[in-house]
Amino acid sequence: MSYSQLVWFKKDLRIKDHSPLYQATKNGKCLCLFVYEDEIINSDDFDTRHFNFLNQSLIDLRKKLRQLGSNLIIRRGECVEVLRKLHNEHPFETIWAHQETGNWISYQRDLRVLSWAKETGIQYKEFYQNGVIRKLNTRDGWSRIWNQRMNEKIIPTSSSIHSPNNIDYGEILSPSNFDLNTTSNSKGLLGGETHAKQCLETFLSDRGKNYQKEMSSPVTAFDSCSRMSSYLTFGNISIKEVYQTSKERADQIRLNKSKSNPEDKGWLKSLSSFQSRLRWHCHFIQKLEDEPEIEHQNINKAYDGLREESFNSEYYEAWLKGQTGYPIIDACMRALKDGGWINFRMRAMLVSFTSYHLWLHWKKPAIELARLFTDYEPGIHYSQIQMQAGVTGINTVRIYSPIKQVTDQDPQGIFIKSYLPELNSVPDHHLAEPHKMTQLEQSMYGCVIGKNYPHPIVNHAEAYRSARDRIHSIKKMKSTKEESKKVFLKHGSRKSNRRPVRS
């Protein structure tokens, strides 16, 4: 009996810099498999926008595999059952796959597949594809290993792939096959390796020149940010390739640097900032890799019980619908529903607002934001959610002012008015707090508060003071500081300018 190799595609939907694919093709005929998993697609953190981006990625991957003489086998079901059936039909001796740090469901899935492979006598070979280190003993030296990995050679693409004959390759499924909302039509980027490379090229050749200066404002971030996050989430391109390509661009600028071109200095600063964020990308995923429970539990147990005692559903629904009475909050929520992306500072502000102003526990907003973010990456998501909610004990407590963010990031209301047309006639100086307009002004500008646009659901100053006092009362406790030391040892950055937690 002839045995094949099996490449199990998960969130690594590309052919370049793909160690499992490259190694498998060197060992004989190769089966390339992707599984639509009902338990993942039906989970609370999955949305049609993810499905659409996934399908676009699969279409592109299948096309590229066909060009190499192979094809992508597509199946639906529970992974172990799919693998068992496929193995009976077309025996394979080795499963080749990338390590994945996903949500709890995918974590348990991986354990089941590994167990089945051992029981069946099938070799299971996993490869890392980023800077996340499995079975990490200490954070000391983590950055050094990350740098080593990012500077390794790009894995070449096989010139051809030999696959067994007489296989039912299956079809790409639609949202309706899973009872997903088929009317959800995100205006975000298109998925796939081809689009990933195009997006990176436009960022490094033009869009990224003011990245460092323009990443914080939603007015400029949509163009000036790299927009590579979704492509990294679905593995349409490796983080190593992104990092090395950005370094090559920086080297090119240094080589051709001209004193008469002030843009060169800005470019180098922007590329340096971008590269540091690629490292942070893996830094945060490492937290979930080391402690999968943070998807459901506070990183710092000293904060258990902080917000669990109540959950104001009216506040939550207003935030969800973009009807809080704070324009920058509402515009961001509507932008997310429209396109599935918003820049980091605005994400942090949204979580800060729910956690402090509305005093909501982070779990339910985290699930909703996961559904809204096309680039939802569980490791980054839950680490950042807890950081912005103030329950890590090792990060600075930041309570973003939704008023100050307007004056700092969108003083002319360019972003706000594009998503809140009811405020189109409101003058710039009233945009941060339209409820402070007089009745006459409200009539003049066609924006009656309580009719055309809601009253603020909470008082900013009062909510700020209350949240600050409550969070700091816990943070300064001796027991909290002791717990925070443990959190820092397990998860804290070892950057030289980072202060350790002190008693």
What do these predicted ranges mean?
Residues 227-429:
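Active-site-proximal binding-pocket segments
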Residues 1-275, 285, 392-503:
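Active-site "lid/cap" and pocket-lining segments within catalytic core domains
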